[in-house]
Amino acid sequence: MKKLRIGYWPLSASLKSAGDRRRLLFWAEARGHTVVTNLSQKVDVIVASENSDFNSNLFSQKNIPVIFDLVDAYLSPLSPTDDFARGLAKKLSGQISGHVKPFSQHVRDFCLSSKAVLCSSIEQEEMIKPYNLNTHVILDSHDEIPFINKSFDNPSLVNENQILWEGQPATIRGVHLISLPLTRLSKSHDVHLNFVTDEKFFQFLNRYIQRNTIGLLKKDLGQINSLVSVIPWTQENLAATAQRCKIAMIPIDLSVPMQRLKPENRLLIMWRLGLPCLVSPSPAYTRVAHEAGVNAVCEDSDTWLRNFRELLNNPSFARDETLRGQNYLRENHTKSILLSKWDKAFESAMD
């Protein structure tokens, strides 16, 4: 493939969001392509994100193919009311021009008009294919996260039962679903819960209704809220916190389609950090846990509690679970695999 000049409508103006740097920018830098955000410049191809103005004339330029990088399940909204409100808010904020309509309809129509659509899980792919058969599943690159070979026999960790949660605050409310097993766990183990995330966030469209993360966690975790720490997300803080922890957890609210259809990225990151990880039974987590041969999926409160105790009480089991996860990474989530998938996606759109 020749070196491309790629026009990109990004998720963040700074290009620093994880969805920018771990996806298109990762591939473009590795392959030597140029990415510009001024779409009026001469480009070979345009990549659109969910924050694009889908009705912009810039996407209708002759002989310039458009690739839609759709990493979340916007085709499966929470409710018709929420879907319309999202579309209306994006119109009123100036993000999307044209007529007001539910956001999922904007996404559907843009899938139909794009030369290729990228997504991040096979579950999302099945939802997109009715609107675009040229769909490619590509997970995020995690090269920015260190691959840690952790010792579970470290004497400094013997009396410390620290548990890690990592991610964006938009998914943090899932922790209230396991407040009961965490409370019961705290009565038998001296635990501490570390949340590596943003200290503040906007509840709607990343720009409206600012919330304090620690306040939400203290409310959701009730009587064990004194066991909570919020650590600002940086690569360094994440790696350092992981070194102090014995387990990671990813509880999610499966009643919210956007959460239920999230890909396996966060589980893979926890394995990369050298931690066994317990997860809610989402389609992606269930699929990957089965493929990796780990006992990670927790169907109910009793299972969460039992699995927490097993990992904390049995370092040998925790080590084996982590090694299975890391072996899965070595076989299924390498830099060369990801780059090849990006190559094929662009080649399919440039034909």
Q: What kind of region is each of these model predictions?
A:
Residues 1-54:
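N-terminal pre-catalytic "stem/leader" segment of glycosyltransferase-like enzymes
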Residues 291-302, 310-316:
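Conserved acidic donor-binding segment of nucleotide-sugar-dependent glycosyltransferases
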Residues 7-27, 140-151, 155-241:
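Conserved catalytic-core segment of nucleotide-activated headgroup transferases in glycan assembly
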Residues 112-150, 158:
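Donor nucleotide-sugar binding/catalytic pocket of nucleotide-sugar-dependent glycosyltransferases
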Residues 76, 89-117:
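Membrane-proximal helix-turn-helix segments that form the acceptor-binding/catalytic region
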Residues 22, 303, 313-347:
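A charged, aromatic-enriched C-terminal amphipathic alpha-helix characteristic of glycosyltransferases
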Residues 170-173, 232-272, 278-287:
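Nucleotide-sugar-dependent
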